Each structure stands twice: as structure tokens, then as C-alpha cells.
Regions:
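Chalcogenol-based redox active-site neighborhoods
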Residues: 1-187
């Protein structure tokens, strides 16, 4: 079943963010663009490489009005311990959401019940709280923050320009397409 245009559910979870624990809720997400970046577990192998890659691009996400939330089924205490012990994770400036009850992972349909962890899922959420893009990778396949940034930018563009679409490999400032009978069979 597709998650596109699904409104995210109500939630309140604890996060580790900038040296402190704080609650994050759906109300904090609404009104701006957001990325929910689910990963299986703290203290693992592919996860820190992805989170570091995302940390290196965080300023670019912020510049386009997009907040990033990493999410695992670990507690906020485990997030802090990982942050304090890993040079890669110390680079994170975005909130690390704790989902020990699996409520978020279940709402986003990435919970692996037999393992008690989330799949490697990425969700772009618009300011109205609806999922507009997502992908779920196999556990051993890491994601690319540059491509995720491009996807968010494309989602923002089509959100603002409803009659235009972004073709493959589109980058901000590049040519877009408009729905037109003249294009049928011409591409």
C-alpha cells in the first residue's frame, strides 16, 4: 500500500538534540518540510555512515526550510551514549528521535517486529504533515544525503508549482516540464 499523501499520525517522543533531552511531537513538525530518517539501531555499522553523511548536509537542508529527524527504536539515553562515544555521531546537529515503543516505526510502516528495529526508511513530509516521497532500503544498503536533498528540493518545487513536474536528475534551476498534450509522445 502506498504511503504517498498519507498524513503522519499524532506522536510525542523523546529526542536527544544538542546535548539535551526534549520532547518532539507532530505539532513541532507541521508548518515546515521534514525528513524522517529511520535506521535500524545505534552502535551499528551502516547507520553511522549515513547519519554522518546527513550531518554533513544538514546546513543545506536547513537552508531550504527542512528539518531532519533521525529515528531508531533505541531510547534517548542510548542516543546520548552513542553521541558521546562516536566522533561521527558527535557531528549530528539534528534531533535524534527515540522510538522504544515502536509507534513511529509502525505509523511509517517500517517496523520489523521479529527484530524489534526499523527498516532503513526515508520519508519526506510536507508542511501539511503528508508524506510526499519515501524509499525503504535493504538493511545493508546505505542512503545518499545529496540525493535526499535533491528529492526534497524537487518536492518543494512541485508543491509550489503544481502545473510543473521535475524530470529525472532534475536540479534546482534546471528546466522542468509542464503537463501538455504537445508533450505526449514527444519525450
Amino acid at each position: 500500500m502506498s504511503m504517498i499523501n498519507k498524513e503522519i499520525g499524532e506522536f510525542t517522543v523523546q529526542a536527544y538534540h544538542q546535548g539535551a533531552f526534549k520532547p518532539i511531537s507532530k505539532a513541532d513538525v507541521l508548518g515546515k518540510w521534514a525528513v524522517f530518517f529511520f535506521y535500524p539501531a545505534d552502535f551499528t555499522f551502516v547507520c553511522p555512515t549515513e547519519l554522518e553523511d546527513l550531518a554533513n548536509k544538514y546546513a543545506d537542508f536547513q537552508a531550504i526550510g527542512c528539518e531532519v529527524y533521525s529515528v531508531s527504536c533505541d531510547t534517548h539515553f542510548v542516543h546520548k551514549a552513542w553521541h558521546d562515544s562516536s566522533e561521527r555521531i558527535q557531528k549530528l546537529q539534528y534531533p535524534m528521535l527515540a522510538d522504544p515503543t515502536h509507534a513511529l516505526a509502525k505509523d511509517f510502516e517500517v517496523y520489523i517486529e521479529a527484530e524489534g528495529v526499523a527498516e532503513r526508511g526515508t520519508f519526506v513530509v510536507n508542511p501539511e504533515g503528508k508524506i510526499v516521497a519515501y524509499e525503504v532500503n535493504a538493511g545493508n544498503v546505505g542512503r545518499n544525503a545529496d540525493e535526499l536533498l535533491r528529492k526534497v528540493q524537487a518536492c518543494q518545487f512541485v508543491h509550489e508549482h503544481g502545473d510543473e513536474v521535475c524530470p529525472a536528475k532534475w536540479q534546482p534551476g534546471a528546466e522542468t516540464l509542464k503537463h501538455s498534450l504537445d508533450l505526449v509522445g514527444m519525450l
